[in-house]
UniProtKB/Swiss-Prot annotation:
Organism: Bacillus velezensis (strain DSM 23117 / BGSC 10A6 / LMG 26770 / FZB42)
Highest taxon in the source lineage: Bacteria
Higher taxonomy: Bacteria, Bacillati, Bacillota, Bacilli, Bacillales
Gene Ontology MF terms in the entry: rRNA (cytosine-N4-)-methyltransferase activity
Main location: cytoplasm
UniProt-recorded name of the protein: Ribosomal RNA small subunit methyltransferase H
Residue ranges with Basic and acidic residues bias: 289-298
SUPFAM superfamilies: Putative methyltransferase TM0872, insert domain, S-adenosyl-L-methionine-dependent methyltransferases
Gene Ontology BP annotations: rRNA base methylation
GO cellular component term of the entry, any: cytoplasm
Length: 311
């Protein structure tokens, strides 16, 4: 069963300012929580295009959302191909788009997917299980310098060098096959006082490897720019991020697209062609309420940003 607690459900979907006859995109179907709530607000003329790379998520949605068959289009694809996939369905512009960039709970909780540091499983971490690159390849074949770089850049891990060195020493003797082996190496590399604070010691390295395996930051950057491009005037984009790298990327893109360019001082009216493309709906990110956090601890790091297309 594909069970998953949706984060910031109403805030994200209501923030899109749903029009019953509109066309919307859920770039991250997952457990279909956002999609279900959105579909409930659409008329028979409304449409939702939902993306996922995960076969289990798509099969689950086919069953649970069967009553919306006429309004729902399910797409098995990475959302970096957003614009291309919409064109394949004859869609050139939409009224709203949402991204929920968290790994879905079933992916985390299914040990054999290799995402979790709580279960011993083969090193995998692929969102799309037909993709070539796995966590096992990253851990065993990437150079020491590349491991240091991704642990520091994507995991913001202070002990990147020590962990990469420990991995390098271990894999010279025999390949690192499982998440459990990797967790033990990380624990050995981090000084004891640091292990006792800041959550699970493997959290940051696992995040870094997952981002590298799935090329998450590059994919998100490409998809967000495409999303802004295909929005109709007045259309909105809602983005939920779970770590500072994605949030920073979203914040900077929204800021850049909602800021005026350098103009000569004293212009009485800003020429239309210089008006910014976006208007910020959220100046500061929306975070989960106390009530939601009591029900779903995974919402703790979630941040929601919303912007509207001006023209």
């Amino acid at each position: 069963m594909f069970q998953h607690k949706t984060v910031l459900l109403r805030e994200t979907v209501d923030g899109l300012n749903i029009k019953p006859d509109g066309t919307y995109v859920d770039c991250t179907l997952g457990g279909a929580g956002h999609s279900t709530y959105l579909l409930q607000q659409l008329s028979e003329k409304g449409r939702l295009i939902a993306f996922d790379q995960d076969d289990t998520a798509l099969e689950n949605a086919k069953k649970t959302l069967s009553e919306y068959k006429g309004q729902l289009i399910l797409v098995k694809s990475n959302f970096r191909y957003l614009k291309e996939c919409l064109h394949e369905h004859g869609i050139t512009s939409v009224d709203g788009i949402l991204f929920d960039l968290g790994v879905s709970s079933p992916q985390l909780d299914t040990p054999e997917r290799g995402f979790s540091y709580h279960h011993d499983a083969p090193l995998d971490m692929r969102m799309d299980q037909s993709a070539a690159l796995t966590a096992k390849e990253v851990v065993n074949e990437w150079r020491y310098e590349d491991l240091v770089r991704i642990f520091f850049k994507y995991g913001e891990e202070k002990f990147s060098k020590q962990i990469a060195r420990k991995i390098e020493e271990a894999r010279e003797k025999s390949p690192i096959q499982t998440t459990g082996q990797l967790v033990d190496l990380i624990k050995d590399a981090i000084p004891a006082p640091a292990r006792r604070s800041g959550g699970h010691p493997a959290k940051r390295v696992f995040q870094a490897i997952r981002i590298a395996v799935n090329d998450e930051l590059q994919v998100f950057e490409e998809a967000l720019l495409q999303a802004i491009e295909v929005l109709k005037p007045g259309g909105r984009v809602s983005v939920i991020t779970f770590h500072s790298l994605e949030d920073r990327m979203c914040k900077m893109t929204f800021k850049e697209k909602s800021s005026l360019p350098e103009l000569p001082p004293g212009l009485p009216v800003i020429p239309e062609e210089f008006e910014p493309e976006l208007k910020l709906i959220t100046r500061k990110p929306i975070t989960a309420s106390k009530e939601e956090l009591e029900e779903n601890n995974r919402a703790r790091s979630a941040k929601l940003r919303i912007a509207e297309k001006r023209k």
